[in-house]
């Protein structure tokens, strides 16, 4: 089983790229599944805190606080989100052979996923000169800063246009296919 981990700051195109990568992998005969480490946080926001699920009004401050300040720091459950992800992958691996995780941001996440699975590629998306509309506090949060401190990405994709993302997804799939042959 192959696992692709997509990293990047807010609004760098992680979900869009994940969908493009999924489509390219399907064209090569794979059965890919797009997943999110933070799925439990989104579930909490929707089910208990009245978020409507609209990406345009994502409760980023809530997600950051719940994931870091409460779950990791206050409750000491550093691996909570990763463990939930691993359980979901274990269950879903009956139906899928490739997993695309579109929201990794922490060095600990990259390292732990690489330890947990044998065949992992970590991809960073960069979107320079883009107004992400985050508050200064959100921009300074560890989940926005740590992604730039990791130095061992397998691929770095510059997101200037949709074509850049599509070309990057195709290039990665072709590179990975040539490694198999």
Residue ranges, per PLM feature:
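Conserved lysine of the Walker
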Residues: 14
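Post-Walker A helix-loop "phosphate-sensing" segment adjacent to the P-loop in P-loop NTPases
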Residues: 23-33
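Extreme N-terminal starter segment of soluble prokaryotic enzymes
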Residues: 1-4
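Small-molecule kinase domains that catalyze NTP-dependent phosphoryl transfer to phosphate-bearing small molecules
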Residues: 84, 116, 121-181
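Hydrophobic positions on the alpha1 helix immediately C-terminal to the Walker A/P-loop
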Residues: 17
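P-loop (Walker A) phosphate-binding loop of NTP-binding proteins
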Residues: 8-9
């Amino acid at each position: 089983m192959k696992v692709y981990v997509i990293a990047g700051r807010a609004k760098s195109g992680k979900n869009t790229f994940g969908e493009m990568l999924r489509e390219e992998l399907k064209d090569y005969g794979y059965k890919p599944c797009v997943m999110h480490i933070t799925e439990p946080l989104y579930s909490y926001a929707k089910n208990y805190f009245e978020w409507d699920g609209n990406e345009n009004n994502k409760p980023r401050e809530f997600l950051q606080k719940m994931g870091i300040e409460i779950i990791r720091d206050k409750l000491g459950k550093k691996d909570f989100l990763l463990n939930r992800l691993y359980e979901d992958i274990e269950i879903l691996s009956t139906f899928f052979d490739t997993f695309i995780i579109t929201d990794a941001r922490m060095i600990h996440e990259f390292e732990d996923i690489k330890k947990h699975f044998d065949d992992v590629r970590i991809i960073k998306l960069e979107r320079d000169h883009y107004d992400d509309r985050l508050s200064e506090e959100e921009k300074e949060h560890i989940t926005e800063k740590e992604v730039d401190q990791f130095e061992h990405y397998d691929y770095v994709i510059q997101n200037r246009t949709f074509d850049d993302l599509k070309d990057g997804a195709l290039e990665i799939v072709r590179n990975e296919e040539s490694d198999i042959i």
